[in-house]
């Protein structure tokens, strides 16, 4: 079970509408239809004209538009360590898991994601095999 590290206080109440993900290019755009109810306002990089753009450009777009970046790519995890939030990053440590498995993970962990969003000092949430945040 993932957790948000260093959370001694109760997290602020975060509503469903507050959590919007920017899905990295390594995730299927079809994922959006499976998570829409839990993450309204989420987008895939293709939808916002960022397909093929650099990680730096995607990072800046997410920062300016209040998105949490969701990715299986290690590069955004590393950027999180280097630059900190915003934006926040959800690193999906799921190997070659398919769209359905990733959708299930994200929907089952929606409360964890909300708690993560409520902690301004937290920049990285790892969901999947390792199940922790930094």
Region spans (language model):
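N-terminal first-folded block
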Residues: 20-68
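Glycine-rich nucleotide phosphate-binding loop and flanking beta-alpha elements
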Residues: 29, 76-78, 133
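C-terminal structural segments of small proteins and small subunits
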Residues: 87-133
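Ligand-binding "clamshell"
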Residues: 79-88
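Small/polar loops that bind or transfer phosphate-bearing groups
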Residues: 23-24, 71-72, 94
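Intrinsically disordered, low-complexity and often Lys/Arg-enriched segments
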Residues: 1-19, 133-134
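Acidic, metal-binding active-site segment of PIN/NYN-like and related structure-specific nucleases
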Residues: 63-80
């Amino acid at each position: 079970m993932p957790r948000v590290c260093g959370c001694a206080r109760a997290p602020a109440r975060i509503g469903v509408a507050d959590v919007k993900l920017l899905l990295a290019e390594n995730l299927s755009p079809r994922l959006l239809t499976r998570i829409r109810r839990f993450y309204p306002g989420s987008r895939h990089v293709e939808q916002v004209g960022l397909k093929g753009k650099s990680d730096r450009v995607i990072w800046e777009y997410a920062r300016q538009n209040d998105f949490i970046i969701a990715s299986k790519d290690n590069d955004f995890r590393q950027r999180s360590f280097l630059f900190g939030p915003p934006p926040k990053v959800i690193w999906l440590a799921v190997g070659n898991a398919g769209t359905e498995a990733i959708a299930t993970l994200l929907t089952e962990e929606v409360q964890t994601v909300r708690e993560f969003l409520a902690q301004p000092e937290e920049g990285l949430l790892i969901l999947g095999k390792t199940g922790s945040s930094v």
